[in-house]
């Protein structure tokens, strides 16, 4: 796969049909990686997914018309937690894995979150070492563990809680500007991203308001990245 052919951008209601398809594929193929279920979301029409795209910030990695991966951003509910955002709903198709698509999606969400939040949080299944390494490289720090956070069938999954301090990230980048292009605490050997990441900064909600995790899928789900999706 040629990474230069991949564009990462914020999805719109016009992408609802293909967003619904890849979302359901993720829920069906990797049920242990999500808080929501295929059974509940497969009952929703495309119009429901269009509304989710209208009221939330969800990014997609596209190669032409094909949607290869998705990742979402939502605010915490409540005035006292409105400074915190969630990275949720990550999924990358099998044919696009190990190509940097997952990283580009996370970077797009980070770029967007920096304009709207002070802290970006996520959770990841504790035995998902590839994802934990990815987040650490991008500056996320582990701050907690939720035992038996998810249950799929008879199996329980612990989740690691991670956060990225966006304020500190801004300070670090200002200090390092003179040293050349460096992203999210990466070493000087960082090289320009091979695919076109377009994190358009526009109002989160349809009327310019702040996004909230109103949909049942976003209320219970933050990023639970399948190890194969990195």
Predicted regions and their residues:
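Acetyl-CoA-dependent GNAT
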Residues: 10-21, 25-95, 106-108, 112, ...
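Conserved catalytic-core motifs of GNAT/GCN5-like acyltransferases
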Residues: 121-125, 136, 141-158
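Short hydrophobic/aromatic beta-strand or adjacent loop that forms the aromatic wall/cage
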Residues: 56, 157-161
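Conserved GNAT acetyl-CoA-binding A-motif
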Residues: 113-123
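Intrinsic, low-complexity polybasic segments
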Residues: 177-186, 190-192, 198-202, 206-211, ...
């Amino acid at each position: 796969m040629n990474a230069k052919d991949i564009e990462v951008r914020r999805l719109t209601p016009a992408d609802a049909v293909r967003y619904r398809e890849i979302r359901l594929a993720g829920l069906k193929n990797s049920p242990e990686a999500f808080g929501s279920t295929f059974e509940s979301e497969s009952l929703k029409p495309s119009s429901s997914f269009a509304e989710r795209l209208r009221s939330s910030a969800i990014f997609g990695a596209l190669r032409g018309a094909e949607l290869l991966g998705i990742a979402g951003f939502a605010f915490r509910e409540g005035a006292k937690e409105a400074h915190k955002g969630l990275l949720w709903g990550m999924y990358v198709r099998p044919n696009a894995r190990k190509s940097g698509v997952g990283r580009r999606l996370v970077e797009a969400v980070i770029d967007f979150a920096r304009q709207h939040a002070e802290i970006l949080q996520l959770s990841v299944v504790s035995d998902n070492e590839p994802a934990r390494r990815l987040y650490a490289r991008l500056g996320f720090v582990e701050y907690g563990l939720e035992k038996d956070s998810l249950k799929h069938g008879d199996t329980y999954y612990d989740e690691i809680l991670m956060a990225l301090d966006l304020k500190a990230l801004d300070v670090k980048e200002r200090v390092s500007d003179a040293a050349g292009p460096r992203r999210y605490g990466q070493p000087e050997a960082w090289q320009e991203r091979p695919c076109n990441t377009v994190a358009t900064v526009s109002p989160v909600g349809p009327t310019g308001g702040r996004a909230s995790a109103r949909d049942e899928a976003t209320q219970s789900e933050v990023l639970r990245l399948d190890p194969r999706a990195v």
